[in-house]
Amino acid sequence: MPTLLLGAAIPFGTIAYTLFIFLILLVMLRKFAWGPLMGIMKEREEHVTNEIDAAERSNAEAKKLVEEQREMLKQSRVEAQELIERAKKQAVDQKDVIVAAAKEEAESIKASAVQEIQREKEQAIAALQEQVASLSVQIASKVIEKELKEEDQVKLIRDYIKEVGEAR
């Protein structure tokens, strides 16, 4: 005899059979479909988590590398600036050395020229004294030839040369 379920004419046996089949299907789905499906989902979740972690590590490493590169660039700029400053200082020092050497050489040339001028002046004065003495002797010998002896003439000339030498 069929029982009615909520006023519908569905036999109880069919309902029990359908419920039994449904329960078997649920058990089979749980064992063969849900288990592996949940395992795959779990693996996928772990894979995605691992990928996210790897991406975060890569991102952190990239940020670290960028920071290191910035620091290296900053350090390179500082070193370049120091190198430029050292080169400028070296150039100034070298300029000072060259200028000092040039001044020293100029002073040496000037001193040498002054000595040369002094020597030539002394030579010119000596030559002039000799010429004056020679001319004086000639003039004096003509003028005084009759009045002075030769010894007196020589003494007179020597005195005259001394006077000319002291006058300079």
From Swiss-Prot:
Main location: membrane
Top-level lineage group: Bacteria
Keywords for the protein's UniProt record, in alphabetical order: ATP synthesis, Cell membrane, CF(0), Hydrogen ion transport, Ion transport, Membrane, Transmembrane, Transmembrane helix, Transport
InterPro entries: ATP_synth_B-like_membr_sf (IPR028987), ATP_synth_b/b'su_bac/chlpt (IPR002146), ATP_synth_F0_bsu_bac (IPR005864), ATP_synthase_B_chain (IPR050059)
Keyword Transmembrane: yes
Subcellular location: Cell membrane
GO cellular component, one term: plasma membrane
Membrane topology designation: Single-pass membrane protein
Single GO molecular function: proton-transporting ATPase activity, rotational mechanism
Pfam families hit by this protein: ATP-synt_B
Family of the protein in this entry: Belongs to the ATPase B chain family.
Function, as annotated: F(1)F(0) ATP synthase produces ATP from ADP in the presence of a proton or sodium gradient. F-type ATPases consist of two structural domains, F(1) containing the extramembraneous catalytic core and F(0) containing the membrane proton channel, linked together by a central stalk and a peripheral stalk. During catalysis, ATP synthesis in the catalytic domain of F(1) is coupled via a rotary mechanism of the central stalk subunits to proton translocation. Component of the F(0) channel, it forms part of the peripheral stalk, linking F(1) to F(0).
Official protein name in the record: ATP synthase subunit b
